A protein has these predicted regions:
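Cell-envelope/ECM-targeting effectors and their regulatory/trafficking segments
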Residues: 1-261
Length: 261
């Protein structure tokens, strides 16, 4: 049990327990989907939008950016900061207080989360996109048991380069559905296809043939190198150059899946 998570749960029930669309949160000090959804419901109540525990585009637009510039003498704004602090605690980041004040400890941990998500330039502000990444149960730190450092580097690079075209993906060093869709979205953006994370016939038709001396862009080759690494085929470099290492890795993949090189 985490005492800070318990404090967050108690605050949520005390603050929103009388709202008809707010189911009581179990006060057990354990972070889980029910607590995360309760935090989202609280934000939706404050923003005056449909209360369903789902952070869709409408909710995110209504909530806006949570930052030190919010006037926390206004209770709605203060509650937004409370909820953001609660989200950080549930995510494993200690903002040095659960008080509804966006102080230096909060700024420090938001910056840390931004860095973990892959951003080099950090602001300390919680944008709607960052808020959606905080208010879920996915890990943005390297998984100590299953995480791979190179996979995490790829996840962070995808967030850094393509966050305008997708939600932030977890940076836990584990290749899964979020990273897979991130790779597809990145490719779709680079080839001028509709960005939806689905590798369908349209994406296939626009996808270039990548070969040594070919015309594929550096960005597309880099995405190929990312994908090879994620499938445990080593291209030697993540540099966007289709050299001997990338060519060898592609041939190894072709052999693995039974394709004739």
């Amino acid at each position: 049990m985490d005492l800070k998570v318990l404090e967050v749960q108690k605050w949520l029930n005390l603050t929103y327990g009388n709202h008809p669309d707010f189911p009581a949160v179990t006060e057990d000090g354990l972070t889980g989907n029910s607590t995360i959804k309760a935090l989202i419901r609280g934000l939706q109540i404050e923003a005056g939008v449909k209360v369903d525990g789902v952070l869709g585009s409408g909710s995110l637009a209504a909530i806006g950016t949570i930052s030190p510039s919010l006037d926390t003498s206004v209770q709605t704004n203060r509650n937004k900061v409370y909820i953001a602090q609660g989200g950080l605690y549930c995510k494993g980041y200690n903002p040095k207080g659960f008080d509804g004040i966006y102080g230096s400890g909060m700024i420090e941990k938001v910056r840390e989360f931004e860095t973990d998500a892959g951003f080099i330039s950090t602001t300390g502000n919680i944008t709607p996109k960052l808020l959606k990444a905080i208010l879920n149960t996915e890990n943005f730190r390297l998984d100590e048991e299953k995480g791979d450092h190179q996979i995490r580097t790829i996840q962070q690079a995808l967030n850094r380069s393509y966050s305008n075209y997708m939600d932030l993906i977890p940076c836990n060093g584990i290749y899964g559905k979020f990273t897979n869709k991130g790779l597809i979205r990145a490719l779709q953006h680079e080839i001028g296809e509709t960005v939806d994370g689905v590798f369908g016939s349209g994406t296939m038709s626009k996808c270039p043939t990548i070969k040594r001396g070919g015309a594929a862009s550096k960005s597309v080759v880099l995405i190929l190198q990312y994908a090879l690494c994620c499938n445990k085929f080593n291209p030697n470099q993540l540099d966007g150059v289709f050299g001997a290492g990338a060519e060898r890795a592609v041939k190894e993949f072709q052999e693995f899946v039974g394709l004739i090189a």
